[in-house]
Amino acid sequence: MRKLFGTDGVRGTANTHPMTAEMALRIGAAVGRYFRREAGGVHRVVIGKDTRLSGYMFENALTAGLASTGMNVLLLGPVPTPAVGLMTRSMRADLGVMISASHNSAEDNGIKFFGPDGFKLSDQAEMEIEEMVATGVRLAQAHNIGRVRRVDDARFRYGERVKSSLTRGLRLDGLKVVVDCANGAAHRTAPEILWELGADVVPIGTSPDGLNINRGCGSTCPRTASEAVVAHGADVGICLDGDADRVIVIDQLGNVADGDQIMALLAARWAAEGRLQGGALVATVMSNLGLERFLGDRGIGLERTAVGDRYVVERMREGGFNLGGEQSGHIVMSDFATTGDGLMAGLHFLGEMMRSGQPSSELVRQFVPVPQLLKNVRFAKGQTPLDAASVQSAIAEAEGVLNGSGRLLIRKSGTEPLIRVMAECEDEALLTRAVDSVVEAVADAVQA
């Protein structure tokens, strides 16, 4: 049974198990030994991080663990998560590591790993690494300890890769863009790329202090960017999260468009151009029913997966699809990247604005969403509220309330101690009734 790894690596509150310096040291040694055993390659690892205060602590602890098993460590500094996947392949490394808790607040942090192909590790690999963390590993002899050095141009190399994914010669002249970098990993890279492409850039969320990542800004708080778009008379807003693997778009009126709308736009365009591989989009069970209907009307399939961009990527690789993502804003374009890339997806949206000549408000409403309601219930460590008979009964009753006119989804979050209760239904009264009844039952089970 997996105890350390969730749906996106290891994550938790800094200085609380499992996110302690001691555990990071042990994880570094275990993953180093695993790749010394498996890769038989250059024994090289790249490490990136976002702007959290605890990132320095975990960077040093992981580096020590990795070097102790003979891995040579290349430190990239603050870079977006997709840059780590890129640099792992570009530098022919055996392993890539990103230190980030993505959209979570500053007190949290996490560690996620990429294999030599730039893709996240498999469940099987993570389970084996967990076993090695528990049992301990053999360290390298003194003369075989790994070397450590910094790589100064990682963000520039990433920026060039992002720009190369766009239509050759594309420029954003005349486009006024608010870009919210969430005080995170892309706080320098995103404004620079937009400026290089000719946009009139209004940067916000670009003053990280180690504690303000995702605080009142970024993709999980688009209100800040929405207000900035309206105040500056901008044409569009691009909101990233702390590690820049998510994107949310704001139109010129201040309206927010999630990942479903962005995926709908890109899928329809790619299908029209004959470059949507497999004739389908890959998305998770959280994507809106309206997206499914929109795609179906255009002869485009929808492949649904469990929640988590890693499962989207796995299905894309299995089925030969090249476009996928999540409602939360992870957009995966596998022709250009191995994981969700918020900045790249945002730039492709801007490219569609320039190509079509349409305002952002026209492009962000590709379909009318079916009313959707999502509520979360927090639980304590060791609790299993979904196993309670009262909760199971409430779920059955809620499904009866919807009676085939909508859908109900209840799941445990893979990154936080939350039970997520989501439903969709055209009848908003039934929708609210169904969700609230389950939320109440789960909350009662937590308090029991």
UniProtKB/Swiss-Prot annotation:
Gene3D superfamilies: Alpha-D-Glucose-1,6-Bisphosphate, subunit A, domain 3, Alpha-D-phosphohexomutase, C-terminal domain. It holds the Pfam family PGM_PMM_III. Mg(2+) binds at residues 102, 241, 243, 245. GO terms for cellular component: cytosol. Binds 1 Mg(2+) ion per subunit. Its EC number is 5.4.2.10. InterPro entries: A-D-PHexomutase_a/b/a-I, A-D-PHexomutase_a/b/a-I/II/III, A-D-PHexomutase_a/b/a-II, A-D-PHexomutase_a/b/a-III, A-D-PHexomutase_C, A-D-PHexomutase_C_sf, Alpha-D-phosphohexomutase_SF, GlmM_bact. The keyword Manganese does not apply. The active site is at residue 102. Its cofactor is Mg(2+). The modification Phosphoserine is found at residue 102. It is an enzyme of class 5 (isomerase). Activated by phosphorylation. It catalyses: alpha-D-glucosamine 1-phosphate = D-glucosamine 6-phosphate. Belongs to the phosphohexose mutase family. PANTHER family: PHOSPHOGLUCOMUTASE (ALPHA-D-GLUCOSE-1,6-BISPHOSPHATE-DEPENDENT), PHOSPHOHEXOSE MUTASE. This is Phosphoglucosamine mutase.
